[in-house]
Amino acid sequence: MSARVTAGSRPANIATGIPVLDHLLTLLARSGRFELALELPPADAEAEVADAGRALGDAFAPLLRADGAYGHGSAFMPADEALAQVALEISSRPLVASNVDLTEARAGGLRSDLAARFLEAFADSAGLTLHVRLIDGEDSRHVLEAIFKALGAALAQASREA
């Protein structure tokens, strides 16, 4: 398993084995203007999603804690009819607080509650308090796209120099 994150705008190089997760992480990288590389060994979807969250959390942690980095950020992002807000802050008590319930939804074959598992593993590994709010949206794929785009933009704010 390998993950690398740097500021920049090269295309993301992501291979999780789960196409919809690859797509969501590509949106995160694009909206945050990060150069993102992630490769995971094959496993079941639940393990791959958690591994991806942990690996990216570990990769983002140094950027978020660098001298002069803001350490907090927030963003609203749309995806078609969906609108999501993500706010985050470096924390010694990582957690995810969300009003999004997609436990029954599927997006591209991915159980959407696996996206919640990704966010929890990511926040824990990066050491973040992460708040996710769905403002509007019906289509589960668009909701997930809006969330991951907002996460990328909020991470960009948090990792940039103050």
How would you describe each model-predicted region?
Residues 1-162:
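Structural preference for solvent-exposed beta-strand-turn elements
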